[in-house]
Amino acid sequence: MACKFRLLLENAEQIVVVCSKEEEYLLEDGMQHLAILEKASLVIGNDGFIKDVGPAETIRNQFSNASFENIIDCSGKCVLPGFVDAHTHPVWAGDRVHEFAMKLAGATYMDIHKAGGGINYTVEHTTTASEEELFCSFKHRLERMLRAGTTLVECKSGYGLKLETELKMLRVIERAHQELDIAVSSTYCGAHSVPKGKSAQEATDDIIANHLPALKQMALNGEIHVDNIDVFCEKGVFDLDSTRKILQAGKAIGLNLNFHGDELNPMNSAELGAELGAHAVSHLEEVSDKGIAALAKAKCSAVLLPTTAYILRLKQPRARDMLKAGVIVSLGSDFNPNAYCFSMPMVMHLACVNMKMSLKEALAAATINAAYALGRAHTHGSLEVGKQGDVVVINASRWEHVIYQFGGHQELIEYVVIKGKIVYKNENVLCL
């Protein structure tokens, strides 16, 4: 009896496997030599994992007696790994479109924050929103990310600050994890800002004494699954000492460290992340040479967010210096009310133009390296045999089009596949 498989992607012009030796991440040199197959096919099994990838003729012969639930003719098209968005804030109510004009007029992030806008504005609206309202808007945002090719996304809480609302946000993220196809890495970010009426020290004590024990108990009860802990380490928010205490307490209950650092001011956050064994530190616009060296030595990923630097007119993260120093560079959209971007193709484009990354470097940073930052490089980030069958099919004969195009990806991405299941089929694809 012939074996049955879930999906065959056949006759692709190019399949960008990314890695070929089970690498957990790629450094600068490895990024220049991405594994790319020409005239190739890929097979995904009924368990949702990749069974084979190789020359189209070879796959055709090896699977001549097999049957497939679905077959996609990829002639003239390219196949890439599903994109991994390593940093987002997608659960909230109350958009901040009105603040965009303020930014254009010269107001800084902290100007808006101190005036009661920014995070505080979103906290007020998120606190009053129902769990169902938050889930509905969150679901739609994840669907838009998926249509732009993202198949694994890191999702933070952090617009509650008080325990009850933080737990509400984490329950919303857990529901998405249970009900939706897109994969989620859940991050507790209760230290995103200092709540009104509290000092940073009081907020730190509250998080350690009350928030984290509640998270631990809910996790033990199977109510939520939280992967990471985040702190906004910044002047006027949580200083280095408070950040250290919160991260250490989170690590003690089994959370991975993945936090905001060196964004608006040099805080020695990168050095702290390296010291504590963090999986990743995000932003790093103001990182020092010493911090870059520390990240490289510790194999702590730098999650760079070109959207934030672009929108806030910050100095660009030093991607080239980091790559040359041996840092594992990853990318994220930083989707939030302040940086309203769902599209990893757009993030990669900005990384190339503004941060001087190459096309291959940007793709590796948005796939295997972003997966590494989330502790998922063993399942995501490349199209190697044994990994989860998460795939993006674009209607172009060269894979670079997904970064080269400045927008318009809704007419380029033809299929998005998760675990071998076609979760998005674009009926409006146009020829180049």
Curated annotation (Swiss-Prot):
Its cofactor is Zn(2+); Fe(3+). 4-imidazolone-5-propanoate binds at Y159, H192, E263. The keyword Transmembrane does not apply. GO terms for biological process: L-histidine catabolic process to glutamate and formamide; L-histidine catabolic process to glutamate and formate. Its EC number is 3.5.2.7. CDD domains: Imidazolone-5PH. One of its GO terms (cellular component) is cytoplasm. Zn(2+) binds at H260, D334. Pfam families: Amidohydro_1. InterPro entries: Amidohydro-rel, HutI, Metal-dep_hydrolase_composite, Metal_Hydrolase. Keywords: Histidine metabolism, Hydrolase, Iron, Metal-binding, Zinc. Fe(3+) binds at H260, D334. Binds 1 zinc or iron ion per subunit. N-formimidoyl-L-glutamate binds at Y159, N336. Disulfide bonds: none annotated. GO terms for molecular function: imidazolonepropionase activity; metal ion binding. Pathway: Amino-acid degradation; L-histidine degradation into L-glutamate; N-formimidoyl-L-glutamate from L-histidine: step 3/3. Belongs to the metallo-dependent hydrolases superfamily. HutI family. This is Probable imidazolonepropionase. It comes from Xenopus tropicalis. The gene is amdhd1.
